């Protein structure tokens, strides 16, 4: 009797085996969370390969259509502009490092947001380098300048420069418009 009750309790603890109800619409990689395309907030890919972006207006069912774009990064930048305009500093951005460089819409009107989003998507933004990735002055870079010939004239060395300055008369002003 004890064996049957322990057997029943084990059966209840197991999760039920899901029934297969046909083919899954997702590939194995998508089911595992692995995707070939980048995944940005507010961006999705159409079946024919174009990327679209839209954002939901707060406290409304409607969405603001931001456009169709050729790359997911363009669509993500458009979404970031709209998110900043609608949600302000609490917005979740795809590229937070570009937040201060993105165009701002003239107003919160959907038309203005769409125009600013299109402008942000059209520009090829390069992410600003982080402080850790900036190149500091190194001895190798300094050596490149030390190998150059001394092109600047030493004004204290009058022996070398006497003939050079004699070609410019003191009484005639030097005007660039004569050349």
UniProtKB/Swiss-Prot annotation:
The keyword Transcription regulation applies. It is found in: Nucleus. One of its GO terms (cellular component) is nucleus. One of its GO terms (biological process) is ethylene-activated signaling pathway. Coiled coil: none annotated. SUPFAM superfamilies: DNA-binding domain. The keyword Transcription applies. CDD domains: AP2. Gene3D superfamilies: AP2/ERF domain. Residues 39-96 bind DNA. Keywords: Activator, DNA-binding, Ethylene signaling pathway, Nucleus, Transcription, Transcription regulation. Residues 1-11 have a biased composition (Basic and acidic residues). Probably acts as a transcriptional activator. Binds to the GCC-box pathogenesis-related promoter element. May be involved in the regulation of gene expression by stress factors and by components of stress signal transduction pathways. Belongs to the AP2/ERF transcription factor family. ERF subfamily. PANTHER family: ETHYLENE-RESPONSIVE TRANSCRIPTION FACTOR ERF039, ETHYLENE-RESPONSIVE TRANSCRIPTION FACTOR ERF042-RELATED. This is Ethylene-responsive transcription factor ERF039. It comes from Arabidopsis thaliana. The gene is ERF039.
């Amino acid at each position: 009797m004890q064996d049957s009750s322990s057997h029943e309790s084990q059966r209840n603890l197991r999760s039920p085996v899901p029934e297969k109800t046909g083919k899954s619409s997702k590939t194995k990689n998508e089911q595992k969370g692995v995707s070939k395309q980048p995944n940005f907030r507010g961006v999705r890919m159409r079946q024919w390969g174009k990327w679209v972006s839209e954002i939901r207006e707060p406290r409304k069912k409607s969405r603001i259509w931001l456009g169709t774009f050729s790359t997911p990064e363009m669509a993500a930048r458009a979404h970031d502009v709209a998110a900043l305009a609608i949600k302000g500093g609490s917005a979740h951005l795809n590229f937070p490092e570009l937040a201060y460089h993105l165009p701002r819409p003239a107003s919160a009107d959907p038309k203005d947001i769409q125009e600013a989003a299109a402008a942000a998507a059209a520009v090829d933004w390069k992410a600003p380098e982080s402080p850790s990735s900036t190149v500091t002055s190194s001895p190798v870079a300094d050596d490149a300048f030390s190998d150059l010939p001394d092109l600047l004239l030493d004004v204290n060395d009058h022996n070398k420069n006497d003939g050079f300055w004699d070609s410019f008369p003191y009484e005639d002003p030097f005007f660039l418009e004569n050349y």
